[in-house]
Amino acid sequence: PCSAGAAHMSHSTSSRSSAQTHPGHKRNQNQDSLHMDDGHGLWVVADGMGGHHGGEIASAIACEEIPEQISQGADIEAALRAAHQKIVARGVAQPELRGMGTTVVVVREQGNEYEIAWSGDSRIYRWRKGKLVQRSEDHSIVQRMLKSGLLSEQQAKTHPHQHVISSCLGSTSADGLEIGYQRDSWEKDDWLLLCSDGL
């Protein structure tokens, strides 16, 4: 497997969240970063990409900048945009890091509700009443083809470009930055799982 980072959390247990990350068997370095703040109800999983440790740096920037922006009053989408701009600026300042980026998924709790935001193919799943449901939608070439009816679900699972993303923090593509967003409410015994695509 590729590198994988994951965090899961619950609204109703005393042990609110836990996380694990692993570089996988193909890489020597782990480019995933995690931020877990049970007290403020904020969790981030970022999966970096890019040479010269660029992915490691990009994911670390995301996990530092997003909580910082939110602590200063930014909304969740603005926090992702600020992290994106910081990663792009770092790549401009250090040419060896140009092209680095990171997928990201964020959960921010607000009382009995929470909001999620993401860019790329890191995912969030909700476990509720015995069912695991994906809440995020990948920003990927294959997902676009699936939505437009060019691929079936089965074809998408085995497509050779299934891991080619269409957006991430740090991307300077003409398509620009895509951010997905949803709100939901906690129900009894709900769990959320945030993970990189390596899981």
What are these regions (language model features)?
Residues 2-199:
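PP2C/PPM-type serine/threonine phosphatase catalytic domain
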